[in-house]
UniProtKB/Swiss-Prot annotation, chain A:
InterPro entries per record: Mic10 (IPR007512)
Coiled coil: none
Family, as annotated: Belongs to the MICOS complex subunit Mic10 family.
Topology of this chain in the membrane: Single-pass membrane protein
GO BP field: cristae formation; inner mitochondrial membrane organization
Membrane topology (Mitochondrial intermembrane): 37-78
Subcellular location: Mitochondrion inner membrane
Protein name as annotated: MICOS complex subunit MIC10
Entry-annotated residues carrying N-acetylserine: 2
Entry keywords, A to Z: Acetylation, Membrane, Mitochondrion, Mitochondrion inner membrane, Transmembrane, Transmembrane helix
Length: 78, 118
């Protein structure tokens, strides 16, 4: 992996983390205000979920050149 | 009867607000692949500052207040990547020569102590 590609992957990871944590936090605020009586745990849950999703995406992104993905190909009936 | 209708209305309003938020997240694919999130962040970065500026101009026009112009922030150029890479390379090269250097220094120290005790 070249350094510019590595830099692009890091940029994508950080942007993705910001968006996902922010989205999780925002959804946590909405659910906390609407259904959960202004408790703190939906915010923590949403932010944690966003962080986990961003980490998983980053991990797949960095391991992408080395992971082999299989594909099922349907037999075409003639 | 009225209380039940009111609590049902409240539940429907809250449900629609929460459902709308979830649909917005799904529609904008904010929790999807990383390139979509990056595109959404870039779009937000392009759209939000002009919108904030226009809103502030509208507020100034309506209220007659004048927002003072702040000076531009100083541009600081610090290549973090270069200094970080140089730091990593220095640390790794130091770690790689550490065993041989430790052997050399301990040998020198032993020779020195042997010479002093003779």
């Amino acid at each position: 992996m070249s350094e510019s590609e590595l830099g692009r992957k890091w940029d994508r990871c950080l942007a993705d983390a910001v968006v996902k944590i922010g989205t999780g936090f925002g959804l946590g605020i909405v659910f906390s205000l609407t259904f959960f009586k202004r408790r703190m745990w939906p915010l923590a849950f949403g932010s944690g979920m966003g962080l986990g999703m961003a980490y998983s995406n980053c991990q797949h992104d960095f391991q992408a050149p080395y992971l082999l993905h299989g594909k099922y190909v349907k037999e075409q009936e003639q | 009867m009225v209380a039940r209708v009111w609590s049902l209305m409240r539940f429907l309003i809250k449900g629609s607000v929460a459902g709308g938020a979830v649909y917005l997240v799904y529609d904008q694919e904010l929790l999807g692949p990383s390139d979509k999130s990056q595109a959404a962040l870039q779009k937000a970065g392009e759209v939000v500052p002009p919108a904030v500026y226009q809103f502030s101009q509208y507020v100034c026009q309506q209220t007659g207040l004048q927002i003072p112009q702040l000076p531009a922030p100083p541009k600081i150029y610090f290549p973090v990547r270069d200094s970080w890479n140089a730091g990593i390379m220095t640390v790794m090269s130091a770690l790689s020569v550490a065993p041989s250097k430790a052997r050399e220094y301990s040998k020198e120290g032993w020779e020195y102590v042997k010479a002093r005790t003779k």
